[in-house]
């Protein structure tokens, strides 16, 4: 599945069925969605920030890992575009949370405890989910899971900073491989050329009005 850039309909359906039936993945979704759709607007913003800044990243680790080794390059380009979009979402929802908290300073301690508790819960679920997701993907499974979790802790700190809190996992985040961090750069491994037809940069088109003479073939 990871060695091909396109999957058959049967493989896609099997992956969907696996996701629906995976307990860790479903608990992971429930942990966030119960607050995302809850009645507390500030907790909703915390959930939205963690959804955009933390929960997406474990599944992107292996394609980035492969791209650092010259495989799945175009897939990594697409992932960088997705992550760029999600970075804006995470920053904005975190910004809105901080502005909302300024209007309710009496809730600062409550929401700080809520946020850190939710992040800890999600990190435990990420470890279980990543074990299910990547189990058997590579011969050195433990090294792979360790790399995933370092990457997840790195993004957990980014999520906390979006919410206005100090990073809590610097020791774990520091174990993220430098090549993975480099692969996140927007201009990393650009492949804008005739043959690939892809890349992780936005190319702005230029319009030119046609003249009558243009249609004289």
Go through each PLM region and give its residues.
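Non-heme di-metal
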Residues: 3-217
């Amino acid at each position: 599945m990871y060695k091909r850039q396109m999957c058959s309909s049967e493989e896609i359906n099997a992956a969907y069925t696996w996701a629906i039936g995976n307990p860790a993945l479903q608990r992971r979704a429930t942990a966030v969605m119960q607050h995302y759709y809850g009645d507390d607007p500030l907790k909703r913003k915390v959930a939205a920030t963690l959804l955009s800044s933390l929960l997406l990243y474990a599944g992107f680790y292996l394609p980035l890992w492969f791209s650092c080794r010259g495989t799945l390059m175009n897939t990594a380009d697409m992932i960088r575009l997705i992550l760029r979009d999600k970075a804006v979402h995470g920053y904005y929802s975190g910004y809105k949370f901080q502005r909302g908290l300024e209007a309710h300073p009496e809730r600062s301690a409550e929401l700080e405890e809520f946020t850190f508790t939710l992040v800890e819960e999600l990190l435990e679920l990420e470890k279980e989910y990543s074990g299910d997701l990547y189990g058997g993907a590579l011969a050195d499974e433990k090294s792979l899971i360790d790399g995933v979790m370092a990457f997840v802790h790195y993004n957990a700190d980014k999520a906390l900073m979006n919410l206005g809190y100090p990073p809590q996992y610097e020791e774990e985040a520091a174990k993220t491989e430098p090549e993975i961090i480099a692969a996140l750069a927007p201009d990393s491994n650009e492949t804008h050329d005739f043959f690939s037809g892809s890349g992780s940069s936005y190319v702005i088109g230029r319009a030119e009005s046609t003249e009558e003479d243009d249609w004289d073939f």
